[in-house]
Each structure stands twice: as structure tokens, then as C-alpha cells.
Amino acid sequence: MSISLFSLAIDQTSSMFFYLSQFLSFLALPLTITISLIVLGAFFIQRKWGKRSLWAGIILLWFFSNPFIANQAMLAWEPQFKAFNEVGNHQIGIVLTGVTNLSKTAYDRTFFNKGADRITHALQLYREGKIKKILITGGQGLNPVNPQSEAELLQRFLVMTGVPAEDVMIEDQSKNTYENALFTKDFLEKKGIDVNQEFILITSAFHMKRSKACFDKVGLQTETFPTDYYSNDTKYDVPTLFFPDPYSIFIWHKLVKEWIGILVYKMVGYL
């Protein structure tokens, strides 16, 4: 009974932090700010501050939709990728989920989102002998549609590619990055695996700072292996420098949501 109550408390806390983070992210999103300024300015266009609001919104919309500026911001945030031959040999590579479409259910395949690099690069590390086993951490998230956890889906994918089932472990209860770290440590301890060894941490580059900090917080040593890059090599051409692109706003949304996530994690003591 006490275990059930504890689990319920954990779930409620996770939900609260998730919705708090989502709400703060919505308020701080570039599109929210720019549209608010433009709409406010349009309604009060006859007033001096209304015109300023309108122009501020238009200028910010151009700023956030500029491909060059968005790419430079993401380049500055994402850590540099590592060559496979620069990675040391480890027993276990830890893969964070968040790369499949859990809103579409199928039992004979995995629907990947952009972040598929997380699992495909983990597979490459395994094939090249850099890791001996793969531990996938991640459950269904909040408000799941698919009854299968992401960890299960990715485990099945790896087995289909020829990885022996005994070399793929899953932790399928975590709902956020902090729980990824916390539940992974608990899983390893229950399996009798040395938690003092160094692991390879595999996740998207934009998400690596928060992920690494969470694993540090719970006492797991990791070598990072960033994947799934949103930034590109710098280009100086007319479309990149001057033409607005909706994808650039998406890049800023990823950055702002990650920054808000880090802020919330610090507020609640996860980092």
C-alpha cells in the first residue's frame, strides 16, 4: 500500500512539473511573444506605444525567423559531436528516449521522429565495440496513446537489427529526464551492475547539458555522446542570411523550451 502511494506521489509530482514547464515555455516561446506584440499593437495602433508594440513584434518575428541567426544560436548551444574513434570503450551505453511517435500505434514497426540518431548511433557504437550493452530509458510519457513504452519499441527495433536480446536492457517507467537518471541508477543497482563505472550517455545534442547534469546529480558518471543535431554548418548565402524560414522559429522553440526546462529543474532541485 505504501509503495502504491509513493508511486502515485511521484506520478503527481512529475505531472505537476511537466505542466509547469509547458506553461512557462508557452509564455516564453518566440511565436507567443511576437504574436502578442503584433496583436496588441494592431488593437492600439492609434497610440504611440501601440505602434511601437507592432513594430517590435514585426522586428522580432524577422529575427526569430532568420535562418542564419537561429542556426548560430543552436550552434552555440549544442556541444561538438565526437568521432566514433575518439570514444572510449564502455560496458554500457545509456540511450534516452523521446525519438518515436507514441501517438501512432503499431505492433510490427517503430515510427521514428527526428531524434532517431539516438538509437541508430547507439547501434553504431555497439557494432564498433565501443559498448557491450545498450540500456534504453524511457516510458510512455504523460497522457500516452500507445500502450507500448518507448523503451519497448526501441528494444524491439534493436533486436530486429540483429542485436542479441540479452544485450538490450530497458527501464520503462521514467517520464522525464530526471527520472531517466534516477530510475536508471535504481535499475542498475537492482541488476547488481556496478554504478561506479563510467557509462556512455547518448541523447540529442540540444538536450545533452540537462541530461548530463541529471545523471551527475544522481551520482552516475557518464561520457557524453551527443547525437541528433539541429544546427548546420555555417553558410553565408542570400537565402540563409535574409529570407525568413518557419523552421528557424521551430529551432528557437526547441532552445527556449530546453532553457525553461533547465530553469524549472534547478528550481525543484533536479540539477
Residue spans for each PLM region:
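Membrane-embedded alpha-helical segments of integral membrane proteins
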Residues: 6, 10-43
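Hydrophobic membrane-insertion alpha-helices, especially the h-region
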Residues: 53-67
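Structural signal for the C-terminal ends of transmembrane alpha-helices
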Residues: 40-49, 65
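A structural signal for short, hydrophobic/glycine-enriched beta-strand patches
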Residues: 63-245, 252
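Short, surface-exposed patches at the edges or C-terminal ends of soluble domains, predominantly
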Residues: 229, 242, 246-247, 260, ...
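Hydrophobic alpha-helical segments of integral membrane proteins
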Residues: 16-24, 69, 73-77, 252, ...
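Alpha-helical transmembrane segments
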Residues: 23, 30, 49-56
